A protein has these predicted regions:
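NAD-dependent ADP-ribosyltransferases
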Residues: 1-128
C-alpha cells in the first residue's frame, strides 16, 4: 500500500498522472525539487506509510490523501526506502536527497495510475 497527498489539480476519478510524463527530470532532481517549485516531472511521488504521508503534508490545510493499491499496478516503481536503491540515483552523500527519501519513505511511480488502484483515505480526525 502506498499513500499520496494529491495536488489541487488531481482528481482520482481520472487516475493519477505526473505533471509532465515526457520530462527528462532525473530521480535526484525530482526528490530535491523543493529548491525549484516550477520543476515538472515524469514521477509521481508516493509515501510508503500513512505516517510518512502525514509528515509530508506538514501544515497543509484540508489535505486530500489517497491510498494506492500496488497489486497489479501497471507502472514502474522506484523504491527509495533503502540506501542501496537511493545510491543508484545519488552516488554522493547528498544529505537532503537521502533524508527526504528516508523521512517520507519515497516510492516514485512512472506511468499512469488507473483510478481502479486509487482510493480516498479520510479517517476521522485526519483533516482537523
Amino acid at each position: 500500500m502506498l499513500y499520496r497527498l494529491l495536488r489541487p489539480d488531481e482528481n482520482i476519478e481520472n487516475g493519477l498522472m505526473a505533471t509532465d510524463p515526457l520530462s527528462d527530470t532525473t530521480v535526484f532532481q525530482h526528490v530535491c525539487k523543493k529548491t525549484d517549485s516550477t520543476l515538472k516531472s515524469k514521477f509521481i511521488s508516493t509515501c510508503g506509510s500513512l505516517q510518512a504521508v502525514l509528515a509530508f503534508k506538514g501544515d497543509i490545510p484540508n489535505p486530500i490523501i489517497v491510498k494506492i493499491w500496488e497489486k497489479n499496478l501497471p507502472v514502474v516503481r522506484i523504491d527509495l526506502r533503502t540506501k542501496e536503491n537511493r545510491n543508484k540515483y545519488c552516488t554522493d552523500a547528498n544529505n537532503f536527497f537521502h533524508d527526504e527519501a528516508m523521512l517520507f519513505q519515497l516510492v516514485l511511480l512512472v506511468g499512469y495510475v488507473p483510478e481502479t488502484h486509487v482510493e480516498l483515505y479520510t479517517p476521522s480526525g485526519l483533516l482537523e
